[in-house]
Amino acid sequence: MLDYALQAKIIKSSDGRLSDDNFTYKDWSLGIYDKARNMMTDPRLIYKKESYKRDSLDIFLRKINTYENYKKDSFIDFTDMIERSIDEVDFPPLEILILDEAQDFTPLQWSVIYKMCSKVKRIYLAGDDDQGIYKWNGADPKYFTTYFPGRKVILRKTRRFGEAIHHFSQIIRRGILDSVEKDYEALQKDGAVKRYLNFNEVPIGKLPGTWYILGRVNTTVNELRMCAKDAGLYYGDNRGNRSFDIKQWAAIKAWTKISKNKKINKKEAELMYKYIRELQDLSFRRDKFWHNLPDYQEYDFKGLKDWCGLDLPDESKDKPWWEILQRNFKPEQITYFIRLLKRYGARQLNAEPQIIIDTIHSVKGGEADNVLIYSKTNWPSAFRNKNISEKSDEKRVYYTGVTRAKNTLHILSTDYKYNYPIGSDYFVYLQEKK
């Protein structure tokens, strides 16, 4: 998609985001086009039904045409593969087919399932229509709850949370239209639901266990990440990215070994040199120099000076890493690493983070001991801007978010003009607790 955007000149090659390895190009019109394909409907009809339109109809159609012409040069996308599988794939016979998260399948994806089912003896569908939060991509929970035949079984007890979180989640669920009636019991365990007006009030790090810190849209997720970084928290996202540069962290660990009279391998030395200014010649930083050295060779401070062009005085060996790694390190990155090491220690920074900060959609299907939900949104996701059906869909999103929590649920409210009124849900919760 990024190559297409560059070729079609939708974004410029000078765009600063291109230097970010995590940057993913997304286009509103192409997203609506993909939704139409998943709904097996004319894109014009889907465009007209959208309450929020970022592009005119003319630009919308031109982007579709440009995208399809781009794909003619031997490119296919994921939706192409699904479409082609309906006509081209001969699915094998199966004894049992188990389909999880069935509420999130689109009509196009159901077409594939129907074809598979013709050769299946027994089929199990699992899902929750109240967590059907992919309508934006054409998903329709009714295929799961209504259209698909068979015996229905409703689970009577959650294995995740206690009464407090269960009660609060049901308050949100009351606003979901066409919800299949289902009563289930909570676990007999302690739990808590609390509300805050400031991120720094939330006891992140003080409560044991894992954390989900969740926002509705990427802009609010980025805001949460900045707050967490300012607080000196170690976190990641649901794609495995960490809150710091792992190459910088590897360089810190390499120099720490050197300063403790230990040796490092060739790979560690080569990476560390990317962050050291004091080299006899720039050639010692290039791949060509390291390529010619044996892989098994290890280096201490003296070896790096004698054979690898390190141009530091002997007394520098005992200096801390932040005085040596002065290249490709911003001051705020150095400060952040120092705070992390003081708070967590190297061993915890080598492990996966206990805190995940991401969108509600990204953690669907997951769970954490503690969950924080941020009510701030942007204009397209603002609750008050939506019609009755769209408000019901927003309720589904927040119901999904709060039911990720196992032990404690934390609500971060905002008076920003675009938001979900989770404070009102919390007020009802307090009134009903009395």
Regions found by a protein language model. Give the residues of each.
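Conserved P-loop NTPase-based nucleic-acid remodeling module centered on helicase motor cores
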Residues: 1-28, 229-232, 236-244
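Accessory N-terminal region flanking or inserted into the helicase ATPase core
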Residues: 9-98, 107-112, 125, 135
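Amphipathic alpha-helical "lid/sensor" segments that cap RecA-like P-loop NTPase cores
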Residues: 21-41, 208-231
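Flexible, charged surface loops at secondary-structure boundaries
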Residues: 90-94, 203-209, 403-404
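Conserved helicase motor core of SF1/SF2 NTP-dependent helicases
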Residues: 96, 103-190, 212-227, 238-246, ...
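Helicase-core coupling region on the C-terminal RecA-like lobe
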Residues: 170-204, 214-231, 236-296
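Conserved helicase C-terminal RecA-like lobe
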Residues: 257-412
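Short, charged/polar "capping" segments at the starts of alpha-helices
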Residues: 417-424
